[in-house]
Regions:
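Structural signature of alpha-helical solenoid repeat scaffolds
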Residues: 183, 216-220, 260, 292
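Bacterial N-terminal signal peptides that target proteins for export
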Residues: 2-13
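Structural detector for short beta-strands of small beta-barrel domains
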Residues: 41-63
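Short boundary/loop segments of OB/S1/cold-shock single-stranded nucleic-acid-binding domains
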Residues: 28-43
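Amphipathic alpha-helical scaffolding segments comprising HEAT/armadillo-like alpha-solenoid repeats
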Residues: 155-166, 188-200, 221-243, 264-276, ...
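Alpha-helix N-cap/helix-start positions at coil->helix boundaries
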Residues: 172-173, 205-209, 233, 247-250, ...
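Conserved hydrophobic register position within alpha-solenoid helical repeats
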Residues: 178-179, 211, 255, 287
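Extracellular C-terminal loop/segment signatures of secreted glycoproteins
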Residues: 81-174, 187-188
Length: 313
């Protein structure tokens, strides 16, 4: 990837991630639903522009991602949802000219009455509205199209495969969604090792972290089955390089956790060195835990060969 493309992708990712994946509800309840999860909330998913913001928001629909609408102009009843929201939940707000991705459900009516056409509520309350930024909105729209396409598959295996393939996308929001789903459903497999290895050098800390977490799941499964992952030694050296040299303490700590999962006694020496010399307390702590695990599971006399602290991966 060229420096210009990488810089552009990094800037776009930072801009969109701040407003989307770490939105106001993350602070309100500790963990917000992901963009992927939000798109699954409603039977209808659209992108639209707010034309009026009174008791009901009048929205001009610009694009329909999922479902069908009786009209290109829809009315959204949101004031009642604001009244009923839980403590700490942010208010739903609409502003003139604002563009949003909206997850919708038809407005409920009294039993026996006919639902009024083109009247909706937000599915998931405040999580049913994702505002489009002034810059980078096309990346968000592209992500919505792709994710809804995956979610619409009827075969669960096809959905899982589509989620894995998100890691190959250039759009960082799709990559982020891919990592979230792969980790949630433990979809990592040996075929993904070359792709995941490339993410160990990605400029985004979150992608390096996520790739290490997927590796931990893959190595854990391999260890439980008692089989050796193809290319496992090369992979361990790559992860060890991250543990020693990544600029992020959080990433280094995760690399240590991932190495611990491999259960290799020959990591004792390097873990001892990291436990005593890494500048970060959290990394030293994780290395100490890994060292304790190694010493508990394997007597020192049975070390065999070791990964030398001076060996260059």
């Amino acid at each position: 990837m060229s420096g210009h493309v990488r810089s552009t992708r990094t800037s776009l990712f930072a801009l969109l991630l701040i407003g989307l994946l770490a939105g106001p509800r993350a602070a309100a309840r500790g963990q917000a639903p992901t963009f992927y999860e939000k798109l699954a909330f409603g039977r209808i998913v659209v992108a639209g522009t707010c034309l009026e913001q009174g008791r009901r928001a009048l929205v001009q629909v610009d694009e329909v991602f999922k479902g069908q609408l009786p009209s290109q102009r829809i009315s959204i009843a949101y004031r009642g949802q604001n009244w009923d929201r839980s403590p700490g939940q942010p208010k739903i707000e609409f502003h003139l000219g604002e563009r949003s991705i909206l997850m919708l459900e038809p407005e409920s009516t009294e039993p026996g009455s006919t639902p009024e056409e083109a009247r909706f509520v937000l599915a998931g309350g405040c999580d049913g509205k994702v505002d489009l930024p002034a810059e980078g909105s096309e990346a968000l729209l592209e992500a919505a199209r792709r994710i809804v396409q995956i979610q619409s598959q009827s075969d669960q295996n096809e959905i899982w495969e589509g989620q894995r393939h998100l890691l190959q996308e250039n759009n960082p929001l799709l990559v982020e969604a891919g990592f979230q789903e792969v980790l949630k459903f433990r979809l990592g497999n040996p075929a993904m090792v070359p792709l995941l290895t490339r993410y160990l050098a990605d400029p985004h800390d979150s992608f390096r972290l996520a790739s290490l977490r997927v590796f931990a799941q893959i190595l854990e499964r391999s260890r439980q089955r008692g089989d050796e992952l193809p290319g496992a030694e090369r992979l361990r050296l790559d992860i060890l390089s991250v543990a020693r040299g990544d600029t992020s303490a959080e990433v280094r700590a995760q690399a240590v956790r991932t190495l611990k999962v491999s259960g290799r006694p020959d990591l004792r020496e390097v873990m001892a060195q990291m436990a005593g010399s890494d500048p970060s307390q959290i990394v030293r702590y994780e290395a100490q835990l890994a060292l304790m695990e190694i010493n508990r599971s394997t007597p020192r006399s049975g070390d065999g060969t070791s990964v030398s602290s001076g060996q260059k991966p």
